[in-house]
């Protein structure tokens, strides 16, 4: 009786972590010999034993945790989430690659291998060559942090759950970082290199991948155990309670460990993960056309991921989840070198799907080696680490970290190493990418500090979190502490500032002083507002060095574009890439990445339009538009972002953006699959014959939509106006081309002659003579960043805001040089100073600021100022001197030839009768400006419609009637201004007399007479 009573109490002691043991369960299910009865010491011994067989995939520093949650199946890719505390303790950065393995439930009671076989987790105990492969025990995945995960618990994605054999809730897992060797491991005490260490996992590119379909009958038990574990958790029935000897590394779980996400995912798993397939997959794979489509979809589904030989991967096929094993067609070599190699699935990887019989027949029918092909000469990590245009900054940072992170490297010589580096520059230039990429590939431990993550509402917790990061870095030297957006964490201390900010600054100052006594720790901070940082941080001993990353030059943009285009199928030649780099003035690395992304979408839309027009199957536009909108929101740092058929990874310094035919076919296949339709063999064959390739015209179209980041808040208008749209004024056109286009196209000529181009041009003349139109045309022809400013827009009622607006305008122009600043109606902005008697006015202060910006202490390099006015006599004389406005161009009314050209331009869009004579019209419109002629053409068209609304063309009488009604603009008062202010260098001597106004002839006659008078006066005086 007592025994029965004791047994009756057993269910009451069960926890909500695992289901009860069943008589018939696979290895993945919970048994009486599960890891609940294994303490931490035994688990550590198991890790040590397993690391001897797989040293590159498991080590003593592995994290011991339990499966607490399974993410929704909408999250694609293999991912695992740890608590923030575990991430910091293990020095893991979000997005790092880790290996995940299962502890063997029988390791305590037998002498079996301490890790659980994934093959056995699926209920297959048969012997095969895969049993000794690393993929049978380890799965490579990407790690992220989550505030919803408790300490010593993990949350896994559904794909990782399938890869591990569907472990039940509460199952013990080992998580181990598999990044490259740290800097401390590269040197021993004698300073000798240890690069020959075999315990390093190499990540190589895979060209071909062979997958074998796993028999569905072996997966029934795994499916039932996986479902029952979470169902029983939800009903309150679970496995026995965790013993006390494991409580020291297990955090308390919530009362309801199963979330609605798990219930949804399990329910979906029941629907899709079937042991009895509703279709014959062997028949599907035997059909070459359907097999080819499935292989393309599988390649897109698996990208990007890292695999090991022997891994199990899940692939959705026809609304069901199918499990494939990573194999190859030939027998594996006898050596064990593949244990140190993992392979990455990229855009070039070709996936081959086989069932068991098909794979066996293929092995017998081939005499050559068929298997996993690695690109041995190309290391994926090295390719990712290249940052375009930042080679100089990369070298500086490498010298600093190499000299500061190695213990006793400089202190033994009596030198003080650099302890802090401040990287500043505009957003999108690659500051964060530079720090993260270098720290990752140099091997040092990386600790990241983000303001929103450490700021807490409770007093003292923010400072404590910051202190824990620095303490962890000091215990894991060599280490780098990276502080992103330093201005948000440590702003300048001001009287009356926030108390939290002042406490954070004080804590950071103390921590920076503390690491000066610790060897092997370097602080790297990044900001785009260096003036907003606490000045005490920028003194020597804290942030000793400062690295400025500015807007890339044309050479740097070319380097960035070449790196981005390596991952894209394009048809651009080197000359076209250089032209694209020259045309993207002011673009930073993030802007160039966005430009390539937009060009890819332009090419994809063009390809889909062509496919839909030539195919009998209409393509739905809604899924494609949805995919395009989702694609722009993908971030490389987001852990929950779903992968897409077209993968575009955004990095600020030149992340690779690529797409190929595989993604397009996959996108179409997903669309057809979701709508329950079937894809025809003819469409697949037609799409397979052509390969998407981004052309130069795609980039030209993308440039109209992508603007430089620094110019987005400025009114940027580059109208589609060419020189052909401006009639006459050839002299003014030549002057503008010399000042704007020549410096871009003939830089060597200016350097050779030892001069610089004109830096400022003022156009003045009667209203309506195409001054603004020519400024718009020169901006469009030169394809430079064009900042159009109207004088009254810069004035503000607040004191100092007007001068600040002028200063900010020129700062943006310099940051996006070469650029053009166009001041329309500049006489309203730069009026003569001292007119008001009540002191210095707002216009006087704005004028002074404008003079300083045009020709002050800072030289304007790459910034051309073009201004237009019809009242040059109202402008301050200090602004008109050479050095500020080198050329003063009088834009007068057109002559007869110019009027004929203007009439031709305005009448080319209006249907005209054959009786219209442009030469006659030009002769009778003497004294009319370009604006008057434009009005004449419009009024003539209105007059034709007044006669009859069915009128199809205008005639000569309509134009003459309009001329008789419109009076020419008064221009006599402007001729005197041309004699006083015009200053230019004639570019066409043959037309000098025609271009020069009548007043200039009297001035040319007066010059020799004045010389003769001066000579006679000197002769008489002598």
UniProtKB/Swiss-Prot annotation:
Keywords: ATP-binding, Calmodulin-binding, Nucleotide-binding. Expressed in the whole plant. ATP binds at residues 425-432, 765-772. Residues 1-44, 230-257 are annotated as: Disordered. Residues 9-18, 230-250 have a biased composition (Polar residues). InterPro entries: AAA+_ATPase (IPR003593), AAA_ATPase_domain (IPR050168), AAA_lid_3 (IPR041569), ATPase_AAA_core (IPR003959), ATPase_AAA_CS (IPR003960), P-loop_NTPase (IPR027417). Gene3D superfamilies: 1.10.8.60, P-loop containing nucleotide triphosphate hydrolases (3.40.50.300). GO terms for cellular component: chloroplast; chloroplast thylakoid membrane. Residues 33-44 have a biased composition (Basic and acidic residues). Residues 1005-1022 are annotated as: Calmodulin-binding. PROSITE patterns: AAA (PS00674). SUPFAM superfamilies: P-loop containing nucleoside triphosphate hydrolases. GO terms for molecular function: ATP binding; ATP hydrolysis activity; calmodulin binding. Belongs to the AAA ATPase family. Interacts with CAM2. This is Calmodulin-interacting protein 111.
